UniProtKB/Swiss-Prot annotation:
Chain spans, region Disordered: 1-30
Annotated protein name in UniProt: Uncharacterized protein L340
Species this protein is from: Acanthamoeba polyphaga mimivirus (APMV)
Polar residues biased stretches: 1-12
Classification of source organism: Viruses, Varidnaviria, Bamfordvirae, Nucleocytoviricota, Megaviricetes
Superkingdom as given in the UniProt entry: Viruses
Amino acid sequence: MDIDLNNQTDNNELIVEDTENPKNPNSTNIEDVGDIGDIEDVGDIGDFENIKKTSVKKISFSPCVFLDLTESEISKYKEHIDKIYLEINQTDYFFENLSLSVKTNDYTNFFNRLGQPHYLLMQKIDDKEIVGSTCIIMRMYVFKCGDKLSRIKYWYISDTRILQEFHKLDLNLKLFKQMYHKLRLKSNRFYTICVDKYQSYTDHLMNKLKIYFNVEFKIDKLLIFLVETTLLRSIEKYFICAYGDIKYMLVPNKTYHIGNKVIKNIYHMQHSRYSSDKSSNISELPINSMVMFCFPEKSPLESIMENLHIKSLITATILSVGMNFFDWHDILTSDIYQI
């Protein structure tokens, strides 16, 4: 039974969630998927028969409630989610992921390509207006063990948008606590990315999380670059060596100002296995376009960029638990569309 003392209604009514204990609470969430031929089931996030569905659908705190959407309810609220993605910008928000965000209904297809989305809507209690949305994605990391492939479940806070007037309510912490309690039963491995202009708030959040959760949060630095396509063509071989097969996806409805230049064609580097049908090879990109990519600090690619006098556009912080041995190159290249 999970009792969150910080999720109380106006009448001081506690919200209680009943769950069954996992069969093996010390499990590392590593699953053997058999021979190579079994890899097609990688999209399945596992057997959850030991997890009892919560009987509480609304987690109250004044003046809003969280609407925790099940898979069947996502279509019911899709109109509200679409409106938020089209009208609410991520600017000046902690989990904004650099504001280079999806502005069209393509966000649905993108999230579905990466894994199994979980949506949490923020709704005003008085007039039922939807004032915010977040998407958390459950994914699989696939790796080879001898002659077999195995998979590990993990999740991450991918995208959050909240109306400006509600930022002051510190919904970040409430949101994080709710989703952590919900998803830790499925996997105790997760990460999220926070831009460094919010460093003071990152420190505040970390101090709070240490109070509520008996886990060790790891911090990694992320370097984000934006370079001209003509330059990237000359150094793409280094990324192919690090990432394998890569393609490029256009960021819709996004312009970027660099000095006196206005860049309208911005592409994101991705692993081709996560790319949509609209992704392109570098030879197909317009000459006047630019490409965004990222990699962790102290990566071998960092010294290559330094030797070429290519500086990062901005830095970010990766907050993670249980992700120490993961290949950040693999994970972040597939997620770069949201950064």
